[in-house]
Amino acid sequence: MKALHFGAGNIGRGFIGKLLADAGAQLTFADVNQPLLDELNKRKRYQVNVVGEQARVEEVKNVSAVNSGSPEVVALIAEADIVTTAVGPQILARIAATVAQGLITRHQQGNTRPLNIIACENMVRGTSQLKQHVFAALSEDEQIWVEQHVGFVDSAVDRIVPPSEAGSTDILAVTVETFSEWIVDGTQFKGQPPEIVGMELTDNLMAFVERKLFTLNTGHAITAYLGQLAGHQTIRDAILDPAVRQTVKGAMEESGAVLIKRYAFDPQKHAAYINKILSRFENPYLHDDVERVGRQPLRKLSAGDRLIKPLLGTLEYQLPHDSLVTGIAAAMSYRSEQDPQAQELVTLLAQLGPKAALAQISGLPADSEVVEQAVSVYNAMQQKLAH
């Protein structure tokens, strides 16, 4: 199995790339970080530190790397059996032209073996969005050919992979938690789905996408935002603070009530899933900074993302949402010198005031009760900070 993976960052190396390599794939990473690519090509292997109760070091072997901007990538797509990505939602649109060129070359070479493309991003149906960008760069004839021979498979991914420790001298080493979940839409494959241990097929992907978004992502973000407000440095410190934990757990229970209503999830199993996630946030071996987890607040406060989407569900089913609203107010309070979106958020709040700013960012009506509620919690948070 020939595999090409876009994104040789921590998630690429520590999660998706690792599962592909473990499955015996001939794996090539595509990235723009030249020193990283050079090192991968020199060593052809790297170490993954899996941390939890039982820490272990696993080696990933027989890998190579190419620059995403090079003609080699096009040639690899023309030959590959599987193409995966972990580049972040913003970059996904940027690699579409390269993917399209690879598919055109594949067509020209008469390669009719099935190819499956799986975007492994923190977004809802990311591969379908990638497909739209790719199709925009194809002629009608090419689109027809691609529809016949190429599967665009949506997925939900879940593994916490913090940045390397400061002082870690190995550019390739990566640390990951023990838990991992990669769920793919089994209905979207062309040909037989590849056998990859750790990749689960489902015919009801949206239930899993929203379960992860509404629980892990919602909880992680709110832990970061409340943690920063309370002066904590790491996610672990924040979630061990009883006041933070109470709101985070409350928010996950509120979003969970939406999932139980929408997808008929088993309430007890979902409660266990929430507890599992809380214990993952407590992992003493993952040093995950609240500032890092909170970054890109504008994206995280947008209509389809981890804070507003579950809130809209509570409104749809007339369910409680006080903790989610507190989380939204905390996100509005996020500050970071390193994050351009945090700077933009501050500007919007100053120019428009909190009410109009939240309405503009989230798409919620400015005169709605929830916006009023979020703004009043936000104002109280700001007053507390001022004292």
UniProtKB/Swiss-Prot annotation:
GO biological process, one term: mannitol catabolic process
Binding site for NAD(+): A3, L4, H5, F6, G7, A8, G9, N10, I11, G12, R13, G14
Catalytic function, reaction form: D-mannitol 1-phosphate + NAD(+) = beta-D-fructose 6-phosphate + NADH + H(+)
NAD found in the keyword field: yes
GO molecular function terms listed in the Swiss-Prot or TrEMBL record: mannitol-1-phosphate 5-dehydrogenase activity
Keyword line: NAD, Oxidoreductase
Enzyme Commission numbers on file: 1.1.1.17
Disulfide bonds: none
One Pfam assignment: Mannitol_dh
Any one GO cellular component localisation term in the record: cytosol
Root EC class: oxidoreductase
Keyword Oxidoreductase on entry: yes
Family (UniProt): Belongs to the mannitol dehydrogenase family.
Protein name in UniProt: Mannitol-1-phosphate 5-dehydrogenase
Gene name per UniProt: mtlD
